[in-house]
Each structure stands twice: as structure tokens, then as C-alpha cells.
């Protein structure tokens, strides 16, 4: 794989962006954007450097946090009347909360045509940059491949009781299972899973690292690119895709009160463009754009179901969260 600096240089000759000259000029007059993002530090840095190399007249100021801290920060700033972001890159479920509160403006990038329709907001408030397919990870020293769970029902076997970990805030997975299986089956399953003495923690990366280190044999709902990355580095970890594979949407949007809207649109265009999506591919992630396959061929075989953001928008993420916490005994 090309190193990121070489990849960046190579990409700039490949694409004409959807922003026309007048749009670029308007963005350069604004001179900067404030980006709120959940993308990991190194990946975020490379993306920003690539954008600023293409558009040296626009400076990106970035704040990074988890999806939970993103939700808290944006809503806290909203209450104080001082939302500072020009661009928000976060989970689709959290973005639905922002949309419902009137915090986003419509922007349909010309690049969005290349993103599958069911991975875009039908009203044009946000667009998926890349999905995060959730898989089950296991420590290869503690679990033989033939013994690893192959189905959701396998997670209920007595042999895994007290030996699995899961993120505390899997509300979108919980909501999507209800859409795919039906509410009755999904609730019944989660109640059975709750009897398996699951160790709940905060952060998918943290849990993946714990599995790789042998601190816990199995991690449920891990991000596939993170497991593949650890495996590539020699960690004692592998993964299995349990059907249905739920994909968390990592989406981009512009706040309704963005101080630098033209520069924000330019950044959105860039992340959705061929160049931006090839960077996503270079990070080992799944590009959201049609025609650009993941580097990892096994990951490319996954056919994920996008998070049920429509129902989350209608019902409310907090409603799913409350029921999820009650089932799993979380505070």
C-alpha cells in the first residue's frame, strides 16, 4: 500500500471536484472552517492535510471526540447559543438528533450521486462518508477459528458466559436488529444475551485492544477495519461477520448556523470525492462511494445493512437508549 504522503500527491491529479471556481473563491474568502469529527487522529490529520494541499487558501481547525462526546459537545453549545462547527463528521444516529433539533442545513453535494441512496439523508441534510461494519472479534490464542461464534445464537452458548465484551452505547445496532428481525424477536434475543454476563465498556477501539491483548476472549460489534488493522500488525485477533451485519454510518453535514458555509461545502465535496474516498480506502476503511472497493478483500465481501436511522429519527435515539440500558442493566 502506498504511504499516505505519496498517496496524497498521487490523488490530486485524479479528480475534478464538484466545487466550481466561484465556490472555491467564496470558500477562500472565508479562509477557514471549524471541523468537529469522530475520525481517529492520524486519519483526520491526513484528510485535513490533503484538503489544505488542494485548497491552500482554506485552513481547517479541528476538534476530535467520540460519538458520545460529540453529541454532548454539540448539544451543550446549542443550549448556550454558540455552536462553533462549520462541518460535523459523526455517526448517523447522532446526526439524526442534530437534524431533529434543527441544527443542520441542507446541502446535496454533486459528489453525493456516487453514494448509494440508502446511505444518504433523503432530505439532503447529511451524506455517508464511510460505513463501519460491525463484526465479532476473538482472540486467536483463546478461541480456535472453528469454535468462534458464527451466528448471533452462538453468542448465547454457555461456554461464552462472562467471556464477552460490548460497547455501552450500541443503540443503533439495537434499533436496526428490531427492523431486521422484528421487535419481538430482537427484544427476546437481547434479553437472552443480557444473561451472558457481558462486560460493558466505553470505546470500540478499547475493547478491540483488550481482545487482542487477551484480556477478554470475544468482542461483540467491533469495527471491522480496526480488527483487520490489528491483525495485519500481528495481533492475536480475528473476526467473524454475524448475519445480519449492521453498518454504523459515519456521515458528514453542515450546521445551519455555519460561519463559513462555502468553505464547509468545499470540505464536504472533498470527503465525498474520488480523492477523499481513496484516502478513506487507504486508511483501511470501507469507502462510501460506489466503485471504490476496500483494500481488504474479506471486508469487501461483507454486505452490511445500514443503521435504521429513519426509525431512530422518528422514535428518538434516547428512546432506544433507555430500553437498551434497561435490558442490559446499565445505568
Locate the predicted segments by residue.
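Extracytoplasmic ligand-binding site segments that recognize negatively charged/polar headgroups
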Residues: 21, 34-48, 60-78, 83-215
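Short amphipathic alpha-helical coupling segments at ligand-binding clamshell hinges
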Residues: 47, 185, 189-192, 250, ...
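A ligand-binding cleft/hinge motif common to bilobed small-molecule-binding domains
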Residues: 93-97, 217-237
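Short beta-strand->loop
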Residues: 104-111, 124-127, 229-246, 255-257, ...
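Periplasmic-binding protein-like
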Residues: 117, 132, 160-169, 190-194, 198-201, 271-293, ...
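A bilobed periplasmic-binding-protein/Venus flytrap-type ligand-binding module shared by bacterial periplasmic
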Residues: 135-142, 178-180, 248-260, 279-280
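Extracellular/periplasmic bilobal clamshell ligand-binding domains
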Residues: 294-331
Amino acid at each position: 500500500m502506498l504511504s499516505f504522503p505519496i498517496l496524497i500527491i498521487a490523488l490530486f491529479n485524479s479528480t475534478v471536484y464538484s466545487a466550481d471556481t466561484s465556490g472555491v473563491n467564496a470558500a477562500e474568502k472565508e479562509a477557514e472552517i471549524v471541523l468537529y469529527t469522530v475520525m481517529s487522529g492520524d486519519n483526520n490529520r491526513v484528510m485535513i492535510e490533503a484538503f489544505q494541499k488542494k485548497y491552500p487558501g482554506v485552513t481547517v481547525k479541528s476538534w476530535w471526540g467520540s460519538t458520545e462526546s460529540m453529541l454532548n459537545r454539540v448539544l451543550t453549545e446549542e443550549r448556550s447559543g454558540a455552536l462553533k462547527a462549520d462541518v460535523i463528521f459523526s455517526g448517523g444516529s447522532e446526526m439524526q438528533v442534530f437534524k431533529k433539533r434543527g441544527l443542520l442545513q441542507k446541502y446535496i453535494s454533486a459528489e453525493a450521486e456516487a453514494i448509494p441512496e440508502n446511505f444518504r439523508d433523503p432530505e439532503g441534510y447529511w451524506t455517508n462518508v464511510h460505513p463501519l461494519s460491525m463484526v465479532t472479534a476473538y482472540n486467536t490464542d483463546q478461541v480456535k477459528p472453528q469454535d468462534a461464534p458464527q451466528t448471533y445464537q452462538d453468542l448465547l452458548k454457555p461456554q461464552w458466559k462472562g467471556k464477552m465484551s460490548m460497547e455501552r452505547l450500541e443503540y443503533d445496532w439495537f434499533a436496526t436488529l428490531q427492523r431486521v428481525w422484528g421487535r419481538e424477536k430482537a427484544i427476546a434475543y437481547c434479553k437472552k444475551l443480557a444473561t451472558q454476563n457481558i462486560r460493558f465498556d466505553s470505546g470500540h477501539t478499547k475493547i478491540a485492544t483488550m481482545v487482542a491483548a487477551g484480556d477478554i476472549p470475544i468482542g461483540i460489534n467491533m469495527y471491522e477495519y480496526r480488527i483487520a488493522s490489528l491483525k495485519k500488525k500481528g495481533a492475536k485477533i480475528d473476526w467473524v461477520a454475524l448475519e445480519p451485519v449492521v453498518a454504523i454510518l459515519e456521515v458528514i453535514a453542515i450546521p445551519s448556523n455555519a460561519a463559513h458555509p462555502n468553505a464547509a461545502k468545499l470540505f464536504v465535496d472533498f470527503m465525498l470525492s474520488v480523492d477523499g474516498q481513496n484516502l478513506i480506502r487507504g486508511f483501511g476503511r470501507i469507502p462510501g462511494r460506489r466503485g471504490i472497493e476496500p483494500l481488504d478483500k474479506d471486508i469487501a465481501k461483507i454486505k452490511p445493512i445500514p443503521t435504521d436511522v429513519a426509525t431512530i429519527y422518528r422514535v428518538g435515539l434516547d428512546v432506544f437508549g433507555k430500553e437498551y440500558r434497561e435490558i442490559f442493566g446499565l445505568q
